[in-house]
């Protein structure tokens, strides 16, 4: 029971949400009541996947979201399933979260030595530097000496796309790589291409010894196998909501990955408030959809609803202890209340998907909503905060 539910959690958005209906030329069958897609919506994407498997082209899929995506658990089974069927084009996006002290997926590692990094997050878009593709931006002094180690043991790579601002110098690599610098910028950023003749699982990036650049600002990298197939990128920021990503400058950055499919997996942070207003959420969702359709007109969109969650509140009282009852022991009790807002957000997402003629997967309902979530708790598959989920 425990293992089957863990598998369901990991596979719901990925395999059940997409693969079960990706090749349906007609309406989605009633056997998948939690999934909506217009007739033939994924037909062109299905064809692109078949071509990639046969001719060595690449299909790019991006899953954008919050902490559930930053941890990598949700996207991993989707990547594994699609790459097993259509070819492994590489690990895809590598978030440099560790360089600012945050968590990251466990199938890659990014380290750094030298002068510390300063970061700005998309949670506060009024920052001093242009926001990067990963929902963060990292900077250090141009004169700083630093190295960055990138390791991807499960996905050997022959090529790396490195994202930096146009005013920052390219990084060099060891083992030595052929460097092709980006010529055209998307917003403030350009993409350099590092290529190796043999596949590697670990490389070191180094800043120039004599650096006369105006700044040293980097946003992350993409790892490619050098073969055709599928790239599945996971981009997430802890605490992110639709309102944080619904910015023209940010959506423009997504075009660097040339996604044929964009999976938007948010909603938990949008509705995790006792002051939640559905109208505010709808405005943010509509703004995001408008920007994606305008800036990425050829990209298919799949919305996923947030999983069930709980509000929690701590209460403190004191218990008199000791033989003479002169000592007081502090006792903290945690109480939980189901987050009804998640149900409202899920209903709104499914409704808006149908209105816009895009796809949506109701993860909230697939997990049983309020009535079904107790079994997840009983099996220990919810974290102590009853918002996040264990693996």
Regions found by a protein language model. Name each.
Residues 61-65:
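Short hydrophobic beta-strand that contains or immediately precedes a catalytic carboxylate
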Residues 70-176, 183-283, 388:
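Conserved SGNH/GDSL esterase-like catalytic core that processes O-acyl groups on lipids
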Residues 238, 247, 309-391:
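Catalytic His-Asp segment of secreted/periplasmic serine-dependent ester chemistry enzymes
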């Amino acid at each position: 029971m425990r293992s089957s539910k863990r598998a369901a959690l990991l596979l719901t958005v990925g395999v059940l949400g997409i693969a079960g209906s990706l090749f349906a030329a007609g309406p989605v069958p009633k056997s998948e009541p939690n999934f909506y897609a217009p007739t033939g919506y994924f037909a062109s994407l299905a064809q692109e996947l078949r071509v990639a498997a046969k001719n060595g082209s690449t299909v790019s899929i991006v899953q954008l979201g919050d902490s559930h995506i930053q941890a990598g658990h949700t996207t991993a089974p989707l990547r594994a399933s699609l790459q097993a069927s259509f070819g492994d084009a590489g690990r895809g996006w590598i978030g440099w979260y560790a360089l600012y002290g945050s968590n990251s997926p466990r199938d890659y590692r990014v380290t750094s030595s030298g002068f510390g990094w300063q970061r700005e997050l998309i949670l506060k878009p009024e920052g001093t530097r242009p926001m990067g593709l990963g929902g963060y931006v990292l900077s250090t002094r141009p004169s700083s000496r630093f190295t960055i180690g990138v390791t991807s043991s499960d996905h050997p790579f022959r090529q790396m796309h490195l994202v930096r601002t146009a005013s920052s110098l390219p990084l060099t690599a060891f083992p030595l790589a052929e460097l092709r610098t980006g010529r055209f910028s998307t917003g403030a950023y350009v993409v350099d291409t590092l290529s190796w003749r043999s596949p590697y699982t670990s490389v070191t990036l180094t800043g120039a010894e004599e650096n006369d650049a105006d700044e040293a600002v980097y946003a992350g990298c993409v790892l490619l196998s050098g073969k055709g197939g599928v790239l599945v990128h996971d981009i997430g920021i802890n605490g992110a909501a639709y309102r944080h990503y619904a910015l023209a400058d940010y959506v423009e950055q997504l075009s660097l990955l040339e996604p044929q499919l964009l999976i938007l997996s948010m909603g938990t942070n949008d509705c995790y408030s006792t002051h939640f207003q559905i109208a505010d959420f709808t405005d943010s969702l509509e703004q995001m959809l408008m920007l994606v359709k305008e800036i990425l007109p050829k990209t298919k969109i799949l919305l996923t609803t947030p999983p069930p969650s709980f509000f929690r509140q701590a209460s403190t009282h004191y218990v008199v202890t000791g033989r003479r009852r002169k000592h007081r022991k502090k006792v903290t009790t945690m109480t939980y209340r189901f987050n009804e807002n998640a149900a409202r957000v899920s209903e709104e997402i499914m409704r808006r998907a149908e209105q816009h003629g895009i796809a949506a997967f109701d993860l909230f309902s697939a997990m049983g909503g309020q009535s079904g979530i107790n079994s997840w708790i009983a099996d220990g598959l919810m974290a102590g905060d009853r918002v996040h989920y264990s693996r």
